[in-house]
From Swiss-Prot:
This is Ribosome assembly protein RRB1. GO terms for molecular function: unfolded protein binding. It is found in: Nucleus. Keywords: Nucleus, Phosphoprotein, Repeat, Ribosome biogenesis, rRNA processing, WD repeat. Associates with ribosomal protein L3. Involved in regulation of L3 expression and stability and plays a role in early 60S ribosomal subunit assembly. May be required for proper assembly of pre-ribosomal particles during early ribosome biogenesis, presumably by targeting L3 onto the 35S precursor rRNA. PANTHER family: GLUTAMATE-RICH WD REPEAT-CONTAINING PROTEIN 1 (PTHR45903:SF1). Residues 42-67, 184-201 have a biased composition (Acidic residues). It comes from Saccharomyces cerevisiae (strain ATCC 204508 / S288c).
Length: 511
């Protein structure tokens, strides 16, 4: 807090100073200083004289000859104190931001992350916004909990000029733990060997002709020693790259990436000029099996036979030709996959079907179903998110032709106030779900929490804000216009998300 002094000149220069933390205190005229009875104001002044605070200084040009001038000077001093204190208080005020309750931010307002709730939080500025990203599996091992961390990932830009778009492979290293230490915490923490290192970002880029709507990395990148990455372009083409040379360049000094590595190894042109968003690699077919769905309701199946890629000429089709917004392969059945449609339907398909039609169609929403996620741990659970900000979890054992019209989600939440843009089950914890939304947040949910839990009830009774929050909500992360969210399977609890303000790499204390 700044310090100023109050200076009063009468027959001779006299200085009466006061320090105050939360009150403005007028000076006492020198002539009255001896005889004035101690009133409440003086008692307050006496109590606070030794505390830290502000000293208001007013320099008189001339002698103050009457009480009116003195009173005017005192009022000016008091106004300055109050103004300074008011501005200081504004800077210190911290409010809890809840997307379903809080007002929109003003033009001069920003949200700041609370560092005490993050174990790790790093922001990566990008040359252009990125609509999609994926984590590249590495050989550094699983269950990595010590710091600093290293991450390989790939993303693609949305440039204002098409020819400036790029497919980017990023190596992020020296990602230190950012959780603030407690004062009582020892300095020799074995888990935090190098807390003060600076993060390092390396990148290898591949030029693109158009914006990439969606990209996916094959889950067999380590075992097959190739990083198969599919991208779905807004021009309708689906490109398959092998990003192994780019990944190798980060760990092999002097390695020269072949020119051929900057070109796709295969291009799916069956979609014509129709763009799309549905894209997924099979987690069970190691040789490579890719599904791609477009905005005209057509889904193409591409497989690798020996060294040659083949796309089935006959697509799987939706009868109403509505857009395929997302695709997910089953984690347990190699021929089964699910799609999300802009007509509000979740459909279950089988690649063995000669009719190339869905086996089951369930009305999941009255608006677009934007994204779906198949649980890695529980093969019959599927999560979905729609354009209204509602997301839910479905038990696929209830998806039968005779019951299709009566199926209801086993859990459903309307916490978000913007379209759901990404959803993902935690691959290491079957009860945790990450949800990204256009309301500028990524939320983490624990489906194992029961609403009638006594501890939850007590917390809600003590805190008004908690009464409006679903008990399953674990965490709210702020990021501008979130587009995609991915879990890192080898670093428990770590997420990577992309928005219009760049990439975030983060891990909370909640997961």
């Amino acid at each position: 807090m700044s310090k100023r002094s109050i200076e009063v000149n009468e027959e001779q220069d006299r200085v009466v100073s006061a320090k105050t933390e939360s009150h403005s205190v007028p000076a006492i005229p020198a002539s009255e200083e001896q005889d004035a009875p101690k009133n409440d104001l003086e008692e307050q002044l006496s109590d606070e004289f030794d505390s830290d605070g502000e000293i208001i200084e007013i320099d008189g040009d001339d002698e103050i000859n009457d009480e009116d001038d003195l009173r005017k000077k005192q009022e000016e001093a008091e106004t300055l104190v109050q103004k300074d204190q008011s501005e200081g208080n504004k800077e210190k005020i911290q409010e809890l931001y809840l997307p379903h309750m809080s007002r929109p931010l003003g033009p001069d307002e920003v949200l700041e992350a609370d560092p005490t709730v993050y174990e790790m939080l790093h922001n990566v500025n990008m040359p252009w916004p990125c609509l999609t990203l994926d984590v590249i599996p590495d050989t550094l091992g699983s269950e990595r909990r010590n710091y600093p961390q290293s991450i390989l990932l790939t993303t693609a830009t949305q440039s204002s000029r098409k020819k400036e778009n790029e497919l980017m492979v990023l190596a992020l290293s020296n990602l230190a733990k950012t959780l603030l230490k407690d004062d009582n915490e020892g300095e020799d923490d074995e888990e935090d060997d190098e807390d003060d290192v600076d993060p390092v970002i390396e990148n290898e880029n591949i030029p693109l002709r158009d914006t990439t709507n969606r990209l996916k990395v094959s889950p067999f990148a380590i075992s097959n020693q190739e990083v198969l990455t599919a991208t779905m372009s807004e021009n309708g083409d689906v490109y398959i790259y092998n990003l192994a040379p780019q990944s190798k360049a980060f760990s092999t000094p002097g390695y020269q990436i072949p020119k051929s590595a900057k070109r796709p190894i295969h291009t799916v042109k069956n979609h014509g000029n129709v763009e799309g968003y549905g894209l997924d690699w099979s987690p069970l077919i190691k040789t490579g099996a890719l599904l791609s769905g477009d905005c005209s309701g057509q889904i193409y199946f591409t497989q690798r036979h020996t060294s040659r890629w083949v796309t089935d000429k006959q697509p799987f089709t939706v009868s109403n030709n509505k857009s395929i917004e997302d695709i997910q392969w089953s984690r347990t059945e190699s021929t089964v996959f699910a799609t999300a449609g802009c007509d509000g339907y979740i459909r279950i398909w089988d690649t063995r079907s000669k009719k190339h039609k869905p086996a089951i169609s369930v009305k999941a929403s009255n608006t677009d179903v934007n994204v779906i996620s198949w649980s890695d741990k529980i093969g019959y659970l599927l999560a979905s998110g729609d354009d209204n900000g509602t997301w839910g979890v479905w038990d696929l054992r209830q998806f039968t032709p005779s019951n299709a019209d009566a199926v209801q989600p086993v859990a459903q939440y309307d916490f978000h106030k913007g379209a759901i843009t990404s959803i993902a089950f935690n691959p290491l914890d079957e009860s945790i779900v990450a949800v990204g939304s256009e309301d500028n947040t990524v939320t983490l949910w624990d489906l194992s929490v029961e609403a009638d839990d006594e501890e939850i009830k007590q917390q809600a009774a003590e805190t008004k804000e908690l009464q409006e929050i679903p008990p399953q909500l674990l965490f709210v992360h702020w990021q501008k216009e979130v587009k995609d969210v991915k879990w890192h399977k080898q670093i428990p609890g770590c997420l990577v998300s992309t928005g219009t303000d760049g990439l975030n790499v983060w891990k909370t204390i909640s997961v």
